[in-house]
């Protein structure tokens, strides 16, 4: 087959009067660019379909004037216990596990996290009693440990660690730098999409007010790594709602659909000391 054969076939069968162009993607990001497109002076007709291929109406991503990023986060804070209750919490300890099946082998990953209100945090991942990964942040410095090798946090990682080590980082958001992107849909649930930083986006349920998803981008050795975390369920612990099951999609574990982590033990106000974060 030559180039001329392909060209001749295209000119014979690819006719503009019976051509359809299918565009898939995030509607809130592509609809504005598609509307108003013209061909030979005539505006193109746009039709919308849901994820099952059924024709539907044009999605509406607009947000009413009385809704802001600040009001959405304030509603979330109230939904999980209220500012006063959250500020009383001294520490959070969480233990969980995930069952994995990779290349025909089944094993269990165990997750542990300890944070306090002094900007100190510890998280570990173990498999079969062996430490797979460890992350520590102690107020102003920290490190990641992988396969026994300790790697100090970079300046950008320290900035993220300071935010992530907070028990409830939403209490300290600077709304002058946070953008309300609009409405969206996550797992068939209508949500508000908020851009917290250039590298972090959060999604809050319009119905319940709860945060149901985070998408965070980090750069490792020049590569952009995107981690998606979806909250499947919350559990009330001493008057505070804490995520009790999450699904995480990360390049570190290239598993279709990600991994589901169930937190079997969640404790508030456990005693901590500086030695816990060495």
Show the residue positions of the predicted features:
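Flexible, processing/modification-adjacent segments and terminal tails
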Residues: 65-67, 71, 78, 136-200, ...
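Mature, solvent-exposed C-terminal subdomains and processed small-chain segments of exported/organellar
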Residues: 1-89
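Envelope-exposed proteins and targeting segments
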Residues: 17-20, 90, 140, 176, ...
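Solvent-exposed coil/turn segments that connect beta secondary-structure elements
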Residues: 24-28, 39, 51-52, 99, ...
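Buried hydrophobic packing residues in well-ordered domains
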Residues: 6-9, 21, 76, 94, ...
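Extracytoplasmic
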Residues: 6, 14-19, 29, 89-91, ...
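N-terminal mature ectodomain segment of secretory-pathway/periplasmic proteins
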Residues: 71-149, 177-185
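Gly/Pro-enriched, hydrophobic low-complexity segments
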Residues: 126-131, 189-277
């Amino acid at each position: 087959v030559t180039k001329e054969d392909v060209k001749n076939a295209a000119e014979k069968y690819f006719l503009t009067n019976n051509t359809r162009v299918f565009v898939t993607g995030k509607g809130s990001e592509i609809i504005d660019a598609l509307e108003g497109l013209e061909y030979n002076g005539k505006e193109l007709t746009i039709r919308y379909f849901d994820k099952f291929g059924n024709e539907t109406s044009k999605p509406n991503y607009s947000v009413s004037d009385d809704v802001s990023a600040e009001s959405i986060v304030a509603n979330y804070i109230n939904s999980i216990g209220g500012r006063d209750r959250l500020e009383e919490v001294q520490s959070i300890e969480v233990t969980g596990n995930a069952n994995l099946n990779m290349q025909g082998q089944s094993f269990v990953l165990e997750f542990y996290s300890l944070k306090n209100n002094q900007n100190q945090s510890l998280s570990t991942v173990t498999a079969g009693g062996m430490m797979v990964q460890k992350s520590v942040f102690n107020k102003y410095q920290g490190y990641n440990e992988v396969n026994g090798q300790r790697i100090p946090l970079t300046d950008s990682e320290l900035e993220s660690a300071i935010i992530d080590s907070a028990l409830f980082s939403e209490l300290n958001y600077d709304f002058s730098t946070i953008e309300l992107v609009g409405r969206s849909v996550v797992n068939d649930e209508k949500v508000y999409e908020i851009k917290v930083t250039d590298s972090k986006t959060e999604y809050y349920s319009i119905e319940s007010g709860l945060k149901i998803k985070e998408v965070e981008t980090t750069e490792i050795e020049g590569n952009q790594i995107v981690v998606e975390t979806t909250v499947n369920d919350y559990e009330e612990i001493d008057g505070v709602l804490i995520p009790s099951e999450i699904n995480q999609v990360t390049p570190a574990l290239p598993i279709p659909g990600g991994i589901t982590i169930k937190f079997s033990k969640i404790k508030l106000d456990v005693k901590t000391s500086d030695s816990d974060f060495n």
